[in-house]
Amino acid sequence: MASITLRRRDAVLLTAMLATETGNVAMNTLFKAATSKGLNSYTFLIYSYLIGSIVLLPSHIFSYRSRSLPSLSLSILCKIGVLGLLGSTYLITGFIGIEYSNPTLASAISNINPAITFILAIIFRMEKASFKEKSSVAKMVGTIVSLVGALVVVLYHGPRVFTPSSPPFPQLRQLLLPLSSSNSDWIIGGCLLAIKDTLVPVAFILQAHIMKLYPAPFTVSFFYFLIASILTSLIGIVAEKNNPSIWIIHFDITLVCIVVGGIFNPGYYAIHLWAVRNKGPVYLAIFRPLSILIAVIMGAIFLGDSFYLGSLVGGILISLGFYTVMWGKAKEGKTQFLSLSEETPLLDENIDDRI
């Protein structure tokens, strides 16, 4: 019965993670389109994160009252504060990087996350690296295969496999036409995105640590959003002190982007914390290579972009790597469950002997 419950939880978690990664690609595309209409990165982050804090406030109160949780100590709050500082830094560099480049490059560079996260998880003993265990080998091989697949999608186009006769949504394609960037902007954007995707794995590890101390995703998300919005506000006010007009929001795609971000980001972050709590940081990071495949598929479906052989081959490799890691995580979870089941009767016998 317990194994069935675990399988259901894993299925729900997998579905939620796929949905959030798809939503994240769409959010990045919407943000890039909004920047072409004058939206500033600081404006988006500050307003959307303030909205996110308000959205999370009721769930934080409900979660705090309805569950038996350890006290929210100053030490835990300080760690959430450090997480907020990390988040503010990689959010600012990430969105400014997208502003200079485009969402596809952001998805491509984010593929360094699994490798860095896996290395950090081994260093902090959150993951095992043993060539004697099939689950560990599967996770390592799957991570490498996913990274290779992502590189194939980015670096190799090949011949066209599929070309739509006309874009399904011509108005949307027209809106997203200004998303191209110059070569110099592309390099600046790439450097900023690389900094962001070096900090993200560090945040994943810290999230896992905080979830062990205080397993309440909505409460941690609320304080994270609150701290990140305050820190981003301070940085934004200093950085844009000579440009006060950026704080004025117009009733167009810029407002839509801010509101959608304020609603989407809290759920996105809470699901990430839930995934880290139940599966660890590597599970969270392995979904990043899927983002480049999702971006290619969404471009073909909604914008009428051509689908190339490189995208097909890379997509197959990403899928193989992803499912290999999932198999490794499932086998690891099954082994832990069986060992726990074996230990429980022994524990009961020891208690009976003592009585």
Curated annotation (Swiss-Prot):
SUPFAM superfamilies per UniProt: Multidrug resistance efflux transporter EmrE
Domain of life: Eukaryota
TM segment ranges: 11-31, 42-62, 80-100, 104-124, 136-156, 186-206, 218-238, 244-264, 290-310, 311-331
Membrane topology classification: Multi-pass membrane protein
Keywords: Membrane, Transmembrane, Transmembrane helix
One function term, GO molecular function aspect: transmembrane transporter activity
Every EamA domain range: 29-154
GO cellular component: membrane
Keyword NAD carried by entry: no
InterPro entries per record: EamA_dom, WAT1-related
Subcellular location, record wording: Membrane
Family to which the UniProt record says this protein belongs: Belongs to the drug/metabolite transporter (DMT) superfamily. Plant drug/metabolite exporter (P-DME) (TC 2.A.7.4) family.
PANTHER family: WAT1-RELATED PROTEIN
Protein name: WAT1-related protein At3g28130
Organism: Arabidopsis thaliana (Mouse-ear cress)
High-level lineage: Eukaryota, Viridiplantae, Streptophyta, Embryophyta, Tracheophyta
